């Protein structure tokens, strides 16, 4: 049921829109506008039955009116279209600050009361409904996860089209009217979102109808698209691959019923064109259509007072938030509010008991076709577990035969093979997204069973590889689009992963933050939202091996962003460091089974050793961290002189090389590897973290700990501040030093190289005793750097090192040239 077919999608209407429906839509618009104002302004007396006084007005007036009446108008017509066509539909509200429209909609269609039975369909329930909006102990101001029917909060603007198109992928019956605010249209992500129509197929995917809500103003400025000429505006959308329609209303004295008739007729014309596109695609999906889009030009704050305090309000930026900010404090503003609310004639819309009259809702859809009840907008309801192949078949087994530390393997290639077979087993519910980096990040085994979906013309097979009009891989050079597509794909019940160069995950820091907030709200207080599949993000081409790029591409700091989400036991973020290919496989298996998470998986793509077996990886992953007993030489914590800890593939490599040298000196140590970073956090802050007892047993209670960490050192310092023995931790991480240089030089400039780590370990044990050795190591670092400067490659003592337990198999070793692989093969 992952892609449920609801109703009878893509059927044209064989009759005109009825006059009863026209009248019903006008009543809906009036009642929704009234309820939207009530949510912003009223705390009591919701129908103004009792003497209406300033005491009925909230003390703090919070919310946004400007976009709301236009949204209410559109929702009336979308509801009518769903009912008349029995069309499976999810609604995207780009200007999510029009939240009163979304909550009013779900109250009117009945789903709000079904999910929140205390909000009854009577006057008492209406009062609670009004009072709770943007109120202490109440609900947020936006189209938040608390609202039935929402998959897009619209808080941070820019992602409406990304979410709309992600929702329709592999969902051929789904129609997504996507409202885009004309202010939102100025954001970067939205600007590139128009190109999404080249990445879907009308045969195998659904249809998005972009609706530009062109009300002319933002918070305090006009919008760009509202001020360009009609010709330029229409040419812009034609250039984006759309067939633009335009509807204009609200700027004269046209009767509202006439406006509804005009819009209903236009909406039918547009939907007929969509049905024709769907029908044609069944026999020809190679010709990309020009999809319809709608420019909806109406006044900002439509139907509010035209002037307040002598200043133009309707049709201006002054209508953006709360037009009557002093409605409680001044009689003049209160009287204007009263007249405004009375203008909707609530007595014609509500029964005596406060319930909404039947003739207001008669035209609306029923059952799961209701916007608030559509299972696609509560994806956990329809989510099915992935059919995962057995992981053992992808294991790098050479480590068993040749020893820990064997080989030179590009870890993500194993993940690519795993994803290939997941797609094979789940051909319409698993996707891979990438910003032109799927091959670069070594996931190209997926092309053995699928293609990159691309509906934008083809040239010679000499240059257009692995491309087709259908496929489970989607690439666009936009991290925003990749994250947005995946989020919506998950929110509508499916599964997936996307990969990015580590430094450029920062492009979508705030998107991760927004999605985390959605998940946090869900797991805390919205039990009716069923768990969705996790955002899985492969973070590769990382700071330590950005071989083809330089300082601009070296920033592992997304770890710090995600760590800010770990303090309330919501458990919506995970940070995993894959030591090698087998660990990456174990992590992927766990992530693909998980729900309601953001899983950031750090794994380098360059050839590297395989340190542990798959069984060892699974055991370590379960614990979050583990001692590598085969690498330790201390028999007990009492015997330990220093703990050598690492998180990340390159830090692990350098710690292991340092341990080899320290072992030859007779130093007693234990080696600890950390895969699940958040398990280090104080168990007082995180009830899934390891206990203090386990922490002390792993890292010792009183011995020095040298921790080589993939990202910024303060991450670890912040996590362990309340842990036993934290004062004895020395954390070495990325120090904001780098360039396009050799692997040794990259770790050298950040004091992460094996020689610096060996010297630091000796310093922690007894700086005076080992002063000569420390000096010798520092001098060798200079020699090794000079070798790289003179020759352009690293010194053999660095590149040729192999862990001593390895039975060297020459066929597993790569030359220095091969060990720096390209970005696109």
Swiss-Prot record:
According to its UniProt record, this protein's enzyme class is lyase
Against PANTHER family, the record matches this protein to: PHOSPHOKETOLASE-RELATED (PTHR31273:SF0)
Origin: domain of life:
Bacteria
NCBIfam families, A to Z: PRK05261.1-4 (NF003619), PRK05261.1-5 (NF003620)
What is the species of this protein?
Answer: Bifidobacterium animalis subsp. lactis (strain AD011)
**Cysteines joined through disulfide linkages:** none
Q: What cofactor is needed? A: thiamine diphosphate
Q: What is this protein called?
A: Probable phosphoketolase
């Amino acid at each position: 049921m992952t892609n449920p077919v609801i109703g009878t999608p893509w059927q044209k209407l064989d009759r005109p829109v009825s006059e009863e429906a026209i009248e019903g839509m006008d009543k809906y618009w009036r009642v929704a506008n009234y309820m939207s104002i009530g949510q912003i302004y009223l705390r009591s007396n919701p129908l103004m039955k009792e003497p209406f006084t300033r005491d009925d007005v909230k003390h703090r007036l919070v919310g946004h009116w400007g976009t709301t009446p236009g949204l209410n108008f559109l929702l009336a017509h979308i509801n009518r279209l769903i009912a008349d066509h029995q069309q499976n539909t999810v609604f995207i509200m780009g200007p999510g600050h029009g939240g009163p429209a979304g909550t009013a909609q779900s109250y009117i269609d009945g789903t709000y009361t079904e999910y929140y039975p205390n909000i009854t369909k009577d006057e008492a329930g209406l009062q609670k409904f009004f009072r709770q909006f943007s109120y202490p102990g109440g609900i947020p101001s936006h189209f938040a996860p608390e609202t039935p029917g929402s998959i897009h909060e619209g808080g941070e603007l820019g992602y409406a089209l990304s979410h709309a198109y992600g929702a329709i992928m592999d969902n051929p019956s789904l129609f997504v009217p996507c409202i885009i605010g004309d202010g939102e249209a100025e954001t970067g992500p939205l600007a590139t979102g128009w190109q999404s129509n080249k990445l879907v197929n009308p045969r195998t995917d659904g249809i998005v109808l972009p609706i530009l809500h062109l009300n002319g103003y933002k918070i305090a400025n006009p919008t760009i698209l509202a001020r360009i000429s009609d010709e330029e505006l229409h040419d812009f959308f034609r250039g984006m691959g759309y067939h633009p329609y335009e509807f204009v209303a609200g700027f004269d004295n046209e009767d509202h019923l006439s406006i509804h008739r005009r819009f209903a007729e236009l909406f039918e014309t547009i939907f007929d064109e969509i049905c024709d596109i769907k029908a044609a695609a069944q026999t020809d999906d190679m010709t990309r259509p020009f999809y319809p889009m709608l420019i909806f030009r109406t006044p900002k704050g439509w139907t509010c007072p035209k002037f307040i305090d002598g200043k133009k309000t309707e049709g201006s930026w002054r209508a953006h938030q709360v037009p009557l900010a002093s409605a409680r404090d001044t009689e003049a503003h209160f009287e204007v509010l009263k007249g405004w609310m009375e203008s909707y004639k609530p007595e014609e819309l509500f029964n005596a008991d406060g319930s909404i009259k039947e003739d207001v809702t008669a035209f609306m859809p029923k059952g799961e076709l209701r916007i608030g009840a559509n299972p696609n907008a509560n994806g956990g309801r329809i989510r099915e577990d992935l059919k995962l192949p057995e992981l053992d078949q992808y294991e790098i087994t050479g480590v068993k035969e040749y020893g820990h530390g064997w080989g030179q393997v590009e870890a993500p290639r194993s993940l690519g093979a795993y994803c290939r077979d997941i797609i094979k087993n789940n051909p319409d519910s698993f996707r891979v997204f990438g910003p032109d980096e799927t091959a670069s990040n070594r996931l190209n085994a997926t092309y053995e069973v699928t293609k990159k979906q691309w509906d934008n013309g083809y040239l010679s097979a000499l240059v257009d590889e692995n491309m087709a009009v259908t496929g489970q891989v989607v690439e666009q050079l936009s991290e925003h689009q990749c994250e947005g597509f995946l989020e919506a794909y998950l929110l509508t019940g499916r599964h997936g992963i996307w990969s990015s160069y580590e430094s450029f995950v920062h492009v979508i820091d705030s998107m991760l933050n927004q999605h985390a907030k959605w998940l946090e709200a869900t797991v805390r207080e919205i039990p009716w939202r069923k768990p969705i599949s996790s955002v899985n993000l492969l973070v590769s081409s990382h700071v330590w091996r950005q071989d083809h790029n330089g300082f601009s591409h070296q920033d592992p700091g997304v770890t710090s962003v995600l760590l800010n989400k770990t303090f309330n036991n919501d458990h919506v973020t995970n940070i995993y460091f894959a030591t090698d290919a087998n660990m990456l496989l174990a992590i992927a298996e766990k992530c693909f089974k998980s729900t309601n998470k953001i899983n950031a998986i750090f794994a380098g793509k360059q050839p590297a050793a395989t340190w542990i077996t798959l069984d060892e990886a699974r055991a370590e992953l379960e614990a979050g961290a583990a001692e590598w007993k085969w690498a330790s030489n201390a028999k007990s914590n009492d015997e330990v002189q220093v703990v050598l800890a690492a998180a990340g593939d390159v830090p692990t490599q350098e710690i292991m090389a340092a341990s080899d040298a320290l072992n030859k000196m007779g130093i007693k140590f234990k080696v600890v590897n950390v895969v699940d970073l958040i398990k280090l956090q104080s168990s007082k802050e995180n009830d899934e973290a390891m206990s203090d007892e386990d922490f002390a047993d792993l890292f010792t209670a009183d011995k020095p700990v040298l921790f080589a960490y993939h990202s910024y050192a303060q991450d670890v310092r912040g996590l362990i501040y309340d842990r036993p023995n934290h004062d004895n931790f020395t954390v070495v991480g990325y120090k904001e030093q780098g360039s396009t240089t050799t692997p040794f030089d990259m770790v050298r400039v950040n004091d992460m190289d094996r020689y610096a780590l060996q010297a630091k370990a000796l310093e922690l044990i007894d700086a005076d005793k080992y002063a000569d050795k420390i000096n010798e190591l520092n001098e060798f670092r200079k020699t090794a750097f000079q070798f790289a400067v003179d020759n352009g490659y690293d010194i053999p003592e660095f590149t040729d090192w192999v862990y001593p337990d390895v039975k060297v198999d020459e066929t597993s070793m790569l030359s220095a040239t091969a060990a720096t692989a390209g970005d696109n093969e």
